[in-house]
Amino acid sequence: MNKLVLVILVLCTTAWATAQPVIKPPKGRIAIIADGNSPDPDDLGGTAISLALLRATSLESRLVHYSHSCDLVRVNRISEAAEYERHAMMQTACDGTARRWGGFENLTFFDAKWQLDETIKDLSKAINASSAEDPLWIIEAGEPDIIGFALAASEKEKHQYVKVVTHHPANDDAGDFYTWQSILDFGVEEVRIPDQNINLKVDESEWDWAKNHSDDRMKFVWLMGKMAEVDDVVKFQKGKWDCSDAGMVLYWITGATNGGVKQGSVTQVKTILEGFLSQNNN
């Protein structure tokens, strides 16, 4: 009987540890470049979760750049009118999450396509501020072109202190002006983790806890992902709640190349966000 109890305790402890990722970010700052104006609307949920994770782990001050709508050349799979909507939706995901969760008052959320020069200048500034003790981790949550333009406009000697995190070749190979190899040719470090769609693009019922949450901050995050599910440009998000790109942020806040969570889960995201909300009531 004692052995059975011990086994149960071990299993429970293991499950708890799996759901309780250790927050141990690497040194340096983080920048996020997302699309959202491409046919796939998944960056709506990804943006909301990314910002909420950074706030929930008290790392919001280390986010030094956030830009969205980085797909600079519209493709025929999304109409001009639908793409126009996406710009507004992505700005709402950024500003709405930031205001409700707090902590991002000093950060400007750039529309990369509509504020191209300002976006490149801001990311270049972050690159130029990098050093061995304060590297810049760039989360590639969209096409690589903005990253390429910013690297080209920044100081070459700073590129050795830049790390670009990616999880899917669909982003790497989607550039209109830069290939993935051309990004690496700048001398940055490639940090590649597994496809985050595996555990973070899930049946929307797995997010019912957020939909029915008592805290409106969590409901707002859920709503951003729901907007992607009801979007009518693509069909592959129907019935899904997708925050896959936020898996790269989860990887970073849990250690990145020093043991970071490479295959994030909804349970881990939930644990972090609910832990913050329970201690920071409105």
Task: Specify the residue positions occupied by each region the protein language model found.
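N-terminal acidic, glycine/proline-rich low-complexity segments
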Residues: 20-282
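Sec-dependent N-terminal signal peptides
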Residues: 4-13
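Bacterial Sec-dependent signal peptides at the C-terminal "C-region" and cleavage site
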Residues: 12-22
